[in-house]
Amino acid sequence: MPYTKIDVNEEEKFFQDQVKEIQQWWKEPRWAKTKRIYQAEDIAKKRSSLKVDYPSSNQAKKLYKLLQEHDKNKSASFTFGALDPVQVTQMAKYLDSIYVSGWQCSSTASTSNEPSPDLADYPMDTVPNKVEHLWFAQLFHDRKQREERLNLSKEERAKTPYTDFLRPIIADADTGHGGITAILKLTKLFVERGAAGIHIEDQAPGTKKCGHMAGKVLVPVQEHINRLVAIRASADILGSDLLCVARTDSEAATLLTSTIDHRDHYFVLGATNPESPDLAALMAEAESNGIYGDKLASIEVEWTKKAGLKLFHEAVIDEINNGNFSNKQALIKKFTDKVNPLSATSNKEARKLAREILGKDVFFDWDVARAREGYYRYQGGTQCAVMRGQAYAPYADMIWMESALPDFKQAKEFAEGVKAKWPDQWLAYNLSPSFNWNRAMPPNEQETYIKRLSELGYVWQFITLAGLHTTALAVDDFANQYSQIGMRAYGQTIQAPEIEKGVEVVKHQKWSGAEYIDGLLKMVTGGVSSTAAMGAGVTEDQFKEKAAGK
């Protein structure tokens, strides 16, 4: 069978034109802070010969412009995790962006239909599918509103409130659901299905936890940078302006997959007792002898007590303080000036410096302290997050530190730390429902918290699970009352407030687009349709009059 004929001169011209187009695109102010480690030629070679323009890229441009304005005004786009089209349409009236939470999808929208806690063990297309669900709803309600408005005169439209239903969506990419190729494909899914931005965290796939669970395992700094590069490369191949948010879970992380990256060395714990046996071998031996459960756990606890677990710089400082030196503080300063959270000093270099200062080696073994799964013990914290945030910044539009508490001082330390190296870096903040807000701060401070954070550079802030919690509260309250007072519960606590507050869903047929679809039917049947949904007899006409009992 003969091959399809192609004009190689035209092929070459098309390629060179694409390269020039990509180069011009990358010169736009949008990319002034973005570092790419590949060339325009690399991207052009990996593109299809058929150019596809993705609507989500327009949404990404819109989101970038929105955040630029917030950054300029020291304000923030603040939003929450949306569960469904009802929530998205109501949010659009008041908020300028939409969030899609992996946690919410895990519990309510897995494509396997199997609910789960936030372990990112749902199928890879789960969150992209939810994005598409909400994106299609946004497009539908935008079309519906547009037709409704254009059926009015210009004078009537000027008096009619307008809702921008096309609020940009930022979605949860978890850890990327695998290696680099998985991240490339996941990014493509998000672009195709309507996301304006995505966030990805530096936890290890397979052990990923909700940011407010224990047992988080980090990947090395460079491994996460590779993920960020993969996201940008995938978006570049698709010609998308997709925003990338780099999340770090290092503030509370306790484990690390590998010590290959010297930037992590400062935060790795090791045994300082030379008599400490290898923990993993000790645990394996105990299991082979039939020891399990609490007894096995007690072996690890006892080992930890005797091992003298410390960070290397702590071990060195202890040696100085316990030694016979007259200038201890000067020696400590000499060491910590070169070995600190942001110095990126390797353990090898730190050992050499300690030997010069002390005249001897400091015993420190991070291998014997490894967990039974092989992970290294890690002691994160705010400065660890700053280190990682600084490393990720050139490859991401926003940086997010997952935190254990809504601690303004900590948020300030992180913001100032990242901005010390990257002054124009945008930041994101999780206003998590996992925090006990009423214990953390009084109501007056809750009210100003978003504003205070925005002044530090947190341009995008979000309550991950507010969609879930508001639904739970509303349904629990209604179900309780309904069980006791029957239809009075619906009439007085649902329908009456809907009417009073002007919540358009009270006319759910109209909200669902029945009039819009009737218009389509009439358009294709010559203007008449006996099966129109909103014709004579529709019960929604009752809402044109004063509701009974009001």
UniProtKB/Swiss-Prot annotation:
Q: Name one Pfam family in it.
A: ICL
Spell out the SUPFAM superfamilies in the cross-references: Phosphoenolpyruvate/pyruvate domain
Where does the sequence pass through the membrane? none
Positions that bind Mg(2+): D172
Single GO biological process annotation from the record: tricarboxylic acid cycle
Q: What is the top-level taxon of the source organism?
A: Eukaryota
Subunit relationships: Homotetramer.
Q: What is the protein name stated in its UniProt record? A: Isocitrate lyase
Organism this protein belongs to: Debaryomyces hansenii (strain ATCC 36239 / CBS 767 / BCRC 21394 / JCM 1990 / NBRC 0083 / IGC 2968)
